[in-house]
Amino acid sequence: MSFPTNFVWGAAASAYQIEGAWDEDGKGPSTWDMFTRTPGKIWEGHTGNIACDHYHRYKDDVAMMADLGLKAYRLSVSWPRVLPDGAGRVNDKGLDFYDRLVDELLSKEIQPWVTLFHWDFPYALFLRGGWLNPESPKWFAKFTEVVVSKLSDRVKHWITLNEPQCFIGLGMGNGEHAPGFKLDMREGLLAGHHALIAHGRAIEAIRSKSKQPAQIGWSSAGGVYYPATQSPEDIAAARQATLSVYSESVWNNSWWCDPVVFGHYPEEGLRAYGEAAPRFTAAEMKVISTPMDFYGCSIFFGVAVKASSSGSVVIARQPPGHPHSHYLWKHTPTALYWGPRFFTERWKLPMVITENGMSNSGDWVSFDGRVHDAARIEFMSSNLLQLEKALREGVDVRGYFAWSIMDNFEWAEGYKHRFGLVHVDYETQRRTPKDSAYWYGDVIRSNGGALDKFASAGTDAPPYVIKETMRYINAHLSEMFNIKDLAAHMRCHPDFLSRKFKKHTGVDLSLYIRRIRIDHARELLKNPDLLIDDAAEQSGFTDRIHFSKVFRRLTGQTPGQYQRQFRVERDASLHTPLKPKNPRSVHA
Ligand code: NOJ
């Protein structure tokens, strides 16, 4: 696997989606606090009032992250928790929460990656026009200064805005998200322009206030198109679709990322939006393009496209029955290969996958007390394998954050969706790590090696599951274990393990275990004083009869005969004078 040793393996969540404590310790309301109270806006009238109660349970949650092996955690700071009115008075108790959270993470060697805006805009500032107010970048810069002054002695990684496409497109365009506006394109893009200036101002604020050199990026969500076939025409079509600006929506990459990286809106976008495009000054564009260190993006799925005979881009529909998530998002792992490739080609910045994951409809606690989310394991492994392919081909990907560390409030969808690696029972707040959480821990510990389990067969190198199985057998020879135990250790089904083992080694797994045990016993029996019972026990056999039977079947001798013969041979060799085999060659 090509993951570099310092690859950042993390998981993410955001303040409103997990914290709860919506009005505690002096927190001011956010637009989401108000929006969730509007009848009909959120599925079954859910709110984030309590959510996962992470505000009170953060210590246990961090301990759980550490147990799972997480190396980094992407959290967001609630702006109105820190500044209840959005500007001016600082709420020390609110700021203190993040201070403690960061300490807790660091005490468990988990790197905090802090997002400054993940959609919970202060309601007080919304009443002053929100992102439509040209003052909004200054408000955001001030808020950033407060947070950075407090946390930057320990926090190094910052993300300014989370997915402007979403909070402008859904919050101001179709009204599905807070504040629930349905503005026309001109106003939506103006709000977006201010948000972009806010992004630049936040970078300036971080650079000037940070107590250590900071790594700064943002998180974009503009959509990925991938080629339906590997033909150069389809690849070109996918590139074009991924980087185009469409006049009817703000769902694109380049309108948002060109200004941030190049300092200008894309020509194609200015043409597409025409009169609706915002007026801007050179000074504003300079602020917007304040250099950042990495390009963060969330990728959950992609859309397959191909080139038509006339050269235009057409969507290549998936056949009926193509796998999809509970959200009905298609399972399209190649998006994790093509997205980073196209983005790097254009913006030439190191990439971080700030979110990737799936909402799974079958995530409930089973009779055995566990959550068996095999689909998520399959989803993440195939996505990660595609990301690995991009890395192998030279795309500079620095990190990957699973969305999400735990089930949470999915905005307008309420608690309908479960994206977590950890299941949350919202009535009891009980956390149950899903199978995928343990699996992801293995992936992290092996720096991606565990993904081998899922890599397609056909490569010569034995996959991780085989290597680890062999290692385990050798390291535990004196213990009694069977294939079921081995499979439980590898977190896979016994049949899967046996099949895979046979396929890659040509040997039956149970025969392999017996052979290794007998080889071990043969070494032990070279000691003439060792009792056969002891040899049996030390090579993991339940009793002497079974041991002798297997020994005989595999070597043609009983353990006693072997021991006697070994002794005779050894004694004979001790008494035979050493003679060169070919005396002529010695004298030549
Ligand atoms: C992106 C958003 O940042 C996050 O808040 C949301 O829950 C996930 N997508 C899943 O929709």
Regions found by a protein language model. Name each.
Residues 43-56:
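Active-site mouth loops of central-metabolism enzymes
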Residues 57-78, 290, 294:
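Catalytic domains of carbohydrate-active enzymes, especially glycoside hydrolases
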Residues 489-490, 497, 501, 539-540:
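Core residues of bacterial helix-turn-helix
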Residues 495, 545, 560:
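Key DNA-contact positions within bacterial/archaeal DNA-binding proteins
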Residues 497, 501, 546-547, 551:
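Short hydrophobic/aromatic patch on the recognition helix
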